[in-house]
């Protein structure tokens, strides 16, 4: 995608701002220090790499920088830490049990064609969850190139497309990604190439069951399917699935108070 002209950036930003508002708004997001999600995930893509799934974990994504923790991971009494250029597995008392620097560079060799280890999955899951929870809020950063890309008809609905080029220093699936917003601005589909799997791994990622968790709108279900070159998805297999069970948010030294009338599913963790 060519560099962002001012008119294109402005048009793309207008759509991005609608998405941001539909997912809770910039004012809420800018208050937050972290988002905690309890979720389970699995799928054919992981089984292809000889990984034991499903995995159920508490995932904490810090706002600002790329820092994600998964616990328990890869087993009880341990946690995984993703920090972009490094992943590590720690014991309950914080001892580093294993570490990999520059984990993205490890993909592409013969071993990775056959199987992934716990650090590989930690890198993939870490950047993926950072992407899913921080998008679309990060698009206010001018380092993200934004271009409106027309509309898309699917399932009787019309979705608006936003083509995004991520900054080169951000760990994510691929630099070029496309998001599809419904009339309310909620992200319903997200296209990318899952590069750690390979340049062939074109994905169509669907989000459904959006719920309001203390003001932050998060989809409860995510399903990832192969994407044909023309853009249509293949219904099978389900490469990745994610089921969100609970979401909590924290701001500063205090957790955000639950508002009356919110769903009882919402919980706030001790900051």
PLM features: residue spans?
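Short, surface-exposed secondary-structure junctions/capping segments
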Residues: 115, 220-221, 258-262
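N-terminal mature ectodomain segment of secretory-pathway/periplasmic proteins
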Residues: 7, 21, 26-100, 148
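Intrinsically disordered terminal and processing segments
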Residues: 140-148, 236-271
